[in-house]
């Protein structure tokens, strides 16, 4: 199967209802269906899906204003390919189980049997690692499971006067379960439920978060459109006397190739629960200049967008580049580098095994590197 194609299997029980032709290659049980599966999907089902998405949008817009104050690690992808495409992409249709952490509707039966590991050396000596697996269920469903560990290293503990009294560690752990379903041959919905455990210097907290996603993929035009309502939920055990909000968010995504050009372009819009996202910029690009508040229409618009492009000429390797304007401008009050906001990714696949790597440098003192290793157990067994 091609690397960026979706596999949809229709139930044999429908064969008497369909106008079908035998596969030219004579494969047993393989048919070309000449009608759309849309006719078998009740209109009421599609209406419920759309109504649910609208309801989520209303709730998020009402409560999402300050939702990015805690649990920001939920916005860090575990996919090296997506990290290299700007760090956010909900519409990338690929045969890669790691991409599903961005949108549960990207999980499909073509990923059945995939096992993947990720490791990332992050800012400030932090180390992130995780494991993800997917398995098909029936003719239209797929489930997935994942665990992600984010360790932030050892930090100094001080008293009110600033005297060092010792050290402490901090970490976040996420356990997640996913399910996706092919509603039609082009439309897929998915849900991701995450249990979050945090431990900071002897204090612990727990939370539940849910992602709802939907993806439309047109194979003929290689067009992918997605919508995600991310991080719905809240804390079930707080650190102290106050509850911390999850970074609930609405996201839209577009990915497409054009003609014979072997490049896929992607644009992802996120932080859609709020418009104004001002930042402060130092006039000389260092942390010692005069700071100016930036809150123009253009600035706010581009701080909501992530751009990416990847080469898709072969299913056995890829190269990608991304640009995140928000990452670059967030570093405006620090010593950002020329490449701040840019990221690159590359990967190869040999038979059942795959390797992916991504690199980014948000500012001069922070070089980040992410590694993915994957294996398809079906091809091995």
PLM feature segments, named:
Residues 63-381:
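Subset of outer-membrane beta-barrel
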Residues 55-63:
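Hydrophobic h-region of N-terminal signal peptides that target proteins for export
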Residues 12-13, 54-55, 88:
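Enrichment for repetitive, rod-forming helical segments
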Residues 6, 20-50:
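Bacterial N-terminal signal peptides that target proteins for export
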Residues 2-9:
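Extreme N-terminal basic, low-complexity initiation segments
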């Amino acid at each position: 199967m091609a690397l960026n194609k979706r596999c949809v299997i229709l139930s044999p029980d429908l064969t008497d209802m369909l106008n079908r032709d035998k596969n030219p290659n004579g494969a047993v049980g393989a048919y070309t269906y000449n009608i759309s599966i849309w006719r078998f999907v009740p209109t009421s089902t599609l209406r419920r899906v759309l109504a649910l998405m609208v309801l989520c949008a209303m709730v998020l817009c009402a409560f999402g204003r300050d939702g990015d104050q805690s649990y920001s690690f939920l916005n860090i992808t575990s996919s090296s390919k997506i990290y290299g495409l700007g760090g956010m992409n909900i519409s990338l249709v690929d045969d890669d189980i790691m991409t599903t952490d961005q949108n549960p509707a990207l999980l499909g039966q073509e990923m059945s049997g995939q096992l993947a590991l990720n490791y990332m050396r992050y800012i400030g000596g932090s180390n992130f690692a995780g494991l993800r697996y997917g398995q098909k269920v029936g003719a239209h469903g797929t489930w997935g499971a994942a665990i992600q560990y984010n360790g932030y290293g050892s930090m100094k503990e001080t008293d009110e006067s600033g005297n060092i009294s010792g050290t402490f560690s901090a970490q976040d752990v996420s356990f997640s379960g996913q399910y996706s379903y092919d509603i039609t041959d082009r439309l897929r919905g998915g849900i991701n439920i995450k249990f979050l455990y945090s431990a900071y210097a002897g204090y612990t907290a727990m939370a539940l978060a849910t992602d709802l996603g939907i993806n439309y993929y047109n194979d003929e035009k290689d067009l992918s459109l997605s919508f995600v309502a991310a991080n719905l939920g809240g804390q079930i055990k707080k650190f102290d006397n106050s509850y911390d909000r999850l970074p609930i968010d609405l996201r839209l995504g577009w990915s497409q190739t054009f003609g014979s050009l072997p490049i896929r372009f992607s644009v992802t819009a996120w932080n859609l629960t709020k418009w104004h996202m001002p930042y402060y910029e130092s006039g000389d690009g260092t942390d010692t200049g005069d700071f100016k508040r930036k809150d123009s229409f253009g600035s706010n618009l581009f701080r909501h967008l992530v751009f990416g492009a990847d080469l898709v000429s072969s299913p056995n390797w890829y190269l990608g580049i991304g640009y995140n304007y928000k990452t670059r401008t967030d570093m405006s009050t620090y010593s950002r580098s020329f490449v701040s906001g840019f990221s690159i990714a590359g990967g190869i696949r040999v038979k059942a095994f795959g390797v992916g790597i991504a690199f980014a440098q948000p500012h001069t003192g922070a070089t980040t590197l992410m590694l993915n290793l994957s294996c398809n157990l079906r091809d091995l067994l």
